[in-house]
Amino acid sequence: MTEYTLKIKLLKEDAKLPQYAHDNDAGMDLFSTEDKIINPGKHALILTGISIELPENTEAQIRPRSGLALKNGVTVLNTPGTIDAGYRGEIGIILINHGEKNFQVEKGMKIAQMVIKPIVKVNIEEVKMLSESQRGKGGFGSTGK
């Protein structure tokens, strides 16, 4: 396993550093710095009070917490959200309430997970033809049930 250093700046007095719940977890929990109600069918930007400096050639992916989704129908709207290495602003999480009741976000609540991933840069080449493959143009359920 490759280890990187993630630099984190706390922007608010009540902000918390991201935390791994267990040693082998891929994602670290992100915490809300605000109280907010999300009505059913609505979404809201929830601020974390942190900004980060990612290691070179990495990205941060923002992913939902399974417990929020299962128990409340609340998930991250743009999943996975990508934070590029050059971004230095406050991390905000767009949560959507697919449940039937209002959802109360509370200060200090775990609202999402952040996973740090290496990135691969590719050279882009325009071509007239692509090579054949076994799958071809099949998609959207083409492999059956």
Curated annotation (Swiss-Prot):
Cofactor(s) needed by this chain: Mg(2+)
Superkingdom assignment: Bacteria
Cysteine pairs bridged by disulfides in the record: none
Signal peptide interval: none
Gene Ontology molecular function terms on file: dUTP diphosphatase activity; magnesium ion binding
EC primary class: hydrolase
Keyword Metal-binding carried by entry: yes
Binding, substrate: 65-67, 78, 82-84
GO terms for biological process, alphabetical: dUMP biosynthetic process; dUTP catabolic process
SUPFAM superfamilies named among the record's database cross-references: dUTPase-like
Pathway(s) served: Pyrimidine metabolism; dUMP biosynthesis; dUMP from dCTP (dUTP route): step 2/2
Documented EC number(s): 3.6.1.23
Keywords of the record: Hydrolase, Magnesium, Metal-binding, Nucleotide metabolism
Reactions catalysed: dUTP + H2O = dUMP + diphosphate + H(+)
PANTHER family hit by this protein: DEOXYURIDINE 5'-TRIPHOSPHATE NUCLEOTIDOHYDROLASE
Function, as annotated: This enzyme is involved in nucleotide metabolism: it produces dUMP, the immediate precursor of thymidine nucleotides and it decreases the intracellular concentration of dUTP so that uracil cannot be incorporated into DNA.
Similarity comment: family membership: Belongs to the dUTPase family.
Protein name: Deoxyuridine 5'-triphosphate nucleotidohydrolase
Organism field: Clostridium tetani (strain Massachusetts / E88)
